Amino acid sequence: MTQFAFVFPGQGSQTVGMLADMAASYPIVEETFAEASAALGYDLWALTQQGPAEELNKTWQTQPALLTASVALYRVWQQQGGKAPAMMAGHSLGEYSALVCAGVIDFADAVRLVEMRGKFMQEAVPEGTGAMAAIIGLDDASIAKACEEAAEGQVVSPVNFNSPGQVVIAGHKEAVERAGAACKAAGAKRALPLPVSVPSHCALMKPAADKLAVELAKITFNAPTVPVVNNVDVKCETNGDAIRDALVRQLYNPVQWTKSVEYMAAQGVEHLYEVGPGKVLTGLTKRIVDTLTASALNEPSAMAAALEL
């Protein structure tokens, strides 16, 4: 049996109509969304299926929607007799999905928690003052140097190490623009502004992290049933306080996705299953470790094929 891990996507993977085919095949998908809707006080399934997209893309609605989609797919896997993965990891918000699936956090608690996380993130930075950009085709050290030089008293830093040659930067809008230009001058192929309202994982998120810490302290954390590799330290914590602390720091520190995938491969993982909408993490995998294979579990045919292995 191939050693496999489950990886859970973050914001950007949501689309109106996501998981419709899975819901038609597996009733547990809509049942999971009904649980989330009860926790939130509005119909989350209707939002994901009917939109409008600008509502689904509001971070405090995106986050519960993606978490619920991932948990629903994991429940399908479990219900159909799928084996437990060797490890789990989630990209940013996806870390919460991993922690729910590993039994660390109660699902309803997590749904409410990530809604608050979205609101705290939005409140931390006034609309229009923060930005993010993807830097393509430049090494990590050059990007860090460009950010340092472009800051000029403002905040800008690398925040998502997605794969070698694909790093996202975030901070104050003007500083991100200056850093993007500096990266291109240093040899980056592209500096692409991202359509987001919140500059995640940079120092501007510290006020949001302080509020999040208060909410995390109210929630029970259990020991994980499957090791979860965290974003911020690339470690598998088992202690509830250590997991909480990593989630707080995650909000204003970079997502170490490249190192997380390398770590899982070093532990003997050979295949990654992406448990959530889209195929963002599947696409990054080969660029990080070329011996790893990856596939997404968000279509009935893909789920059925994986369950047969």
UniProtKB/Swiss-Prot annotation:
UniProt keyword Lipid biosynthesis, yes or no: yes
Superkingdom of origin: Bacteria
Keywords, sorted A to Z: Acyltransferase, Fatty acid biosynthesis, Fatty acid metabolism, Lipid biosynthesis, Lipid metabolism, Transferase
Transmembrane parts of this sequence: none
Pfam families named among the record's database cross-references: Acyl_transf_1
Positions in coiled-coil regions: none
Pathway(s) served: Lipid metabolism; fatty acid biosynthesis
Enzyme Commission number: 2.3.1.39
Enzyme class: transferase
GO biological process terms, semicolon-separated: fatty acid biosynthetic process
Catalytic residues as annotated in Swiss-Prot or TrEMBL: 92, 201
GO MF annotation list: [acyl-carrier-protein] S-malonyltransferase activity
Cellular-component GO terms for this entry: cytosol
Catalysis: reaction(s): holo-[ACP] + malonyl-CoA = malonyl-[ACP] + CoA
InterPro entries cross-referenced by the UniProt entry: Ac_transferase_dom_sf (IPR001227), Acyl_transferase_dom (IPR014043), Acyl_Trfase/lysoPLipase (IPR016035), Mal-CoA-ACP_Trans/PKS_FabD (IPR050858), Malonyl_CoA-ACP_transAc (IPR024925), Malonyl_CoA-ACP_transAc_FabD (IPR004410), Malonyl_transacylase_ACP-bd (IPR016036)
Family the UniProt entry places it in: Belongs to the FabD family.
Protein name: Malonyl CoA-acyl carrier protein transacylase
